[in-house]
Amino acid sequence: MSNKQLVKPKTETKTEITTEQSQKLLQTMLTMSFGCLAFLRGLFPDDIFVDQRFVPEKVEKNYNKQNTSQNNSIKIKTLIRGKSAQADLLLDWLEKGVFKSIRLKCLKALSLGIFLEDPTDLLENYIFSFDYDEENNVNINVNLSGNKKGSKNADPENETISLLDSRRMVQQLMRRFIIITQSLEPLPQKKFLTMRLMFNDNVDEDYQPELFKDATFDKRATLKVPTNLDNDAIDVGTLNTKHHKVALSVLSAATSSMEKAGNTNFIRVDPFDLILQQQEENKLEESVPTKPQNFVTSQTTNVLGNLLNSSQASIQPTQFVSNNPVTGICSCECGLEVPKAATVLKTCKSCRKTLHGICYGNFLHSSIEKCFTCIFGPSLDTKWSKFQDLMMIRKVFRFLVRKKKGFPASITELIDSFINVEDQNNEVKERVAFALFVFFLDETLCLDNGGKPSQTIRYVTSSVLVDVKGIVIPNTRKQLNVNHEYKWHFTTSSPKAESFYQEVLPNSRKQVESWLQDITNLRKVYSEALSPSSTLQELDLNSSLPTQDPIISGQKRRRYDLDEYLEEDKSSVVNDTIKAKDFDESVPAKIRKISVSKKTLKSNW
């Protein structure tokens, strides 16, 4: 009889990855990703690159290059500095913009876009999203689409993740990234690159990375994707080290292959919207117990899938589809949530969209023939800054028209009256300040300087606390002093009033185009009034300078009698209170600070 001695297996001990190691590994992964995509997408000549191998085990003390199989490593391409100004610029974006922002823990996402002519019309996009955890208690996983998830019995909060574990995750992620990128359609010879950065709530208001400029309120960059897109094809995966978490996705508008497949239905997607919607879904998942499952797909894949599936029934070729969770049951193009008491809801007869009455002139009936989108067509981007300005001015004016007792006691009270608190941010305040500037320019508002307003026009006089900056008197180019009270007059029948807020409803694309051009021109005037070169001063109440622009004789402008809208039996203006029940009080998306590269990178060889 033989005796076998039982030997207790040796327990493997791991040294947890440090924050510094995690930072360096994240930078290595980004550098490899940029090098590989630049090579595989033909952005630069071959002599700009150098071959390297990423070996996860290289950090081990007993690492021996001779004993390491190539199967345990991955061949990658990296960019060389000093051989191309364009390649150097790409590396500068990465090192001076991205790496610094990650160290400050303020970068939420970076979007590297490839385009042909218009930097907001992307042909291809690579998006990286970032999360940070100071308490080191984040679940660890490599979320590659279609791969099995780890054991459900493990306690990820107590699991130690070493540097080697993290490097192996990077290797898996890079392999999938290379496979996906290799499968994309070839790009045209001449193309351009732009980088956008979206920041989280930790960012300093004045922070601006080198080589970047603010683009928070610029037109968003979007990508046209087919409604029958294979969702798994866009997601690369997620790296989580307990210190940093980064997810990578690829979106490509390879129109040639789509059209060959007979697909003519598309939607336009803002890559950053996927990140923000993913954030909301994560919050929901935290409150719902997870069901047993053998396979998982990434959050980005799920979000895009929901977006595509929700648009199948009514999608039109190259139609922009609004997927706006902000307004709940109301899908008004203004994109803001309005308090229940501020407006009734109207319906567009053409597209059945639900709209805010104050955005559509407090129209008498419960439905309108066509909304802005139906009139203008699918090329209207409701996220255009000029369009958002237009809707804000119309909203403010119509709210003031129905408020018989005069202007609210303060600018903040005005904003509170027609915009839900959750939607109030610096962008909203700035647009309201611009709206008031337009009203002062048109003499719809007139500052009281001791004289009497016109006897031929009916005014409502109010004392108002100015508690929002940026309110400028046009002809003097002087800002009203914040936290000071002023008296001014409001009228609905100024002969200089602009038609884009006086008209109850739009009636043609040409008219809307004209309105948007008027907004653009007025924005330039407002910007000049705010610029340092204008030598802005605080307005002195005792100043003898005129506060109204002179009316130029000989100019005729349509005169509007808005008193007809105040007749109790005819108009919804006075009785404009919401009657809808169970209004969806969904949490609105936040406005994030966004920066864009000052220069675009040209690739043509």
From Swiss-Prot:
It holds the Pfam family HORMA. GO terms for molecular function: chromatin binding; four-way junction DNA binding; zinc ion binding. One of its GO terms (biological process) is reciprocal meiotic recombination. It is found in: Nucleus; Chromosome. The keyword Metal-binding applies. Probable constituent of the synaptonemal complex during meiosis. May interact with RED1. This is Meiosis-specific protein HOP1. It comes from Saccharomyces cerevisiae (strain ATCC 204508 / S288c). The lineage of its organism: Eukaryota, Fungi, Dikarya, Ascomycota, Saccharomycotina. The gene is HOP1.
